Swiss-Prot record:
Main subcellular localisation: cytoplasm
EC number(s) per entry: 6.1.1.4
Pfam family, one: tRNA-synt_1_2
Name this polypeptide is given: Leucine--tRNA ligase
Organism: Thermotoga maritima (strain ATCC 43589 / DSM 3109 / JCM 10099 / NBRC 100826 / MSB8)
Binding-site residues, ATP: 583
Amino acid sequence: MKEYRPQEIEKKWQEVWEEKKVFYTPQRSEKPKYYALVMFPYPSGTLHVGHVKNYVIGDIVARYKRMRGYNVLHPFGYDAFGLPAENAAIEKGIHPEEWTRKNIATIRQQVKKLGISYDWSREIATCDEEYYKWTQWIFLQLYKNGLAYKKKAAVNWCPKCKTVLANEQVKDGKCERCGTSVTIRHLEQWFFKITDYAERLLNDLDKLTGWPEHVKTMQRNWIGKSTGAEIDFPVEGSDTKIRVFTTRPDTLWGVTFMALAPESPLVEELVPEEKKEELQEFLERVKQQDRFRRTSVEAEKEGFFLGRYAINPVTGERIPIYVANYILMEYGTGAIMGVPAHDQRDFSFAKKYGIPIKVVIKPADKDLDPEKMEEAYEGEGIMVNSGPFDGTPSSEGIEKVINWLEEKGIGKRSVQYKLRDWLISRQRYWGAPIPIIYCEKCGVVPVPEEDLPVRLPKDVEFLPTGQSPLSFHEGFKKTKCPVCGGEAQRETDTMDTFVDSSWYFLRYVNPHLEDKPFEPDDVNYWLPVDQYIGGVEHAVLHLLYSRFVTKVLHDLGYLNFDEPFTNLFTQGMIYKDGAKMSKSKGNVVSPDEMIEKYGADTLRMYILFMAPPEKDAEWSDAGIEGVHRFVKRLWNTFYTVLPFVKEENTENLVLKNSTEKELRRKLHSIIKKITEDIEGGFKFNTAISGLMELVNHLSQYLNSVPQEEWNRKLLREIVEKLTLALSPFAPHLAEEFWHDLGNDSLVVQQSWPSYDPKALEVEEVEIAIQINGKVRDKVVVPVDISEEDLKRIVLERERVKEYVDGKPIRKFIYVKGRIVNIVV
């Protein structure tokens, strides 16, 4: 028998696929289109099996859809700009581009070894000039349409990465990438006006029926829509007004203090001269605190009384103005009305600073005494101490108070979003340069489209100074104004790498087009992506930004669709020793080592067999060994059968007995089940179980029936359908089997195996015979037998007679197709 040598077989078939351009995708076809896409990787080094999981999932989908008659687009590329490349330059003295290209070459080789069906002619890297030229073009489209702007802003600053971070890149007050505590700086920065799209980004989530609900919930929470009122509180002895946004205008009568965010410009405006020094000390102390943790209910509340008062517009009362550490500029207006009786953070603050507590909402069943309250009452209730609204249920009061405020001209209805504009400036080198020029005479001038790309210079010093390395490169910085021709300077910040990945799925359509980012006809044929696959960690950032950029390009007339991804699948992680794989933990499993030891087909099947693909799974060496044993058993079974079926076909197949009928029924029912498993939610683990079950049934037949009685036509049908169903999961093995069955064509070019509904019909059924509650016998009978005939057959069986002879039968119960119950 031929020996299984996976490395030889896999290399051979990968070369055949490449040579014959099997996965090259034509732009147009008579077939329906299917765009299968896996999130592209950041090329930081080598891939581990956790990364490989989603590429394998994507490949099953692409290969299956190809066999179902679709024109499949299945491309690959690299999210190649970013901080680690620059950090490598600083630490190891290697140029970011060289480091990146080396890693890309490694990843490409790793992915090819897996036998993934990518159209390599469409490969992209976001650091290629032919790519980032169009990232810059997208920036210009946003700029021209008022969606890109520059302003001085309090920004998140990572002292270690020496760059600005978007809000989304800060987790619990720490830099998402390096874990350093984030500080605040005031810098001139570029923003994209994503807030203009907040309502559409929110509402259109309802259109995304092919997305997991938890991902949509994460986006809804991030956008964070709140409906309430904006109210102006006049500052005593001044023309200044403090505007607050509140979702609880029904509590206005309970306001006993105002609080400003430490970052609010009003703080400097309102502080009296004699308090400035003391205030500065307070602000310095607060700046050291974790900005995001300081807002939590549990965090220690700190405040500074400014010595100024505001007037409550509904009661006319004087209320003290504080600066408070738990207020952030990011939310609402950066100022709040303090209602200690009905907000826990305000309650803690008021208790600490001796501020009065005034109850204005009481539960229906009891009164509240402010002196005895140990925590705020935040529930619904009846409005009290609230002037004209006394006795109003608070649930109705919100709407009534807003209407009243508008009538009186004190406030107005308002919708606010937690979402903030997307900060895209980065003070780093390895990113797409922002295509803007500054001219003393003409001001801010966009680079003309015909002058794109603004190229990154190669000869740059990578000192982590907190300024972009480009700001020290005179050759890059100095330029001519495209309007007046005078001396000018380039913008030296580069774009957030999330800008690069916000449109890459559009570029795969025409990856090497020189005069535009994509052909409108092609992009509107292929997009939206039919199936997008990637980690849930990108639920907010990448997916939200991609939706935003797609909507902008749609509104500007470049796209016919305004949502980029029809279906989204988020795969689970692979853990080792109970933890996420990482080099620092030393628990990384290398796909290269697994392929060397077991072959890519075993690795692919094990990754899919471990657990449902959306679930996290623990890597097990014993588990991959078990799958490898199955693969070898499959190989041996196939080559045992091959000599008997190689010259055979399946025409005029005759089934001679019930064993053959049952075997063929199992074949077709398993093919049906595997098809349903793939179609109905990517149940790849149970699909592979189906393949294993089929091999078991085949082995049982071969072992129990003499060779000379084997039904060769039936065996030919089984190994053919088995090979076809195997091919998305273990494509190299399937190609070898298909070739050795005498086919000149490739298995990847075949249709998915069909099942015969007639073969699924059961002609005979095994019935258990239970006497007084215990199974005593079994009988095989025609499936449509009448109860009368069945009773006669059962009572004539010797084994049954032993228990019932001479005894009156009280009951004879038949559960159709399953069991007979006799009570004597």
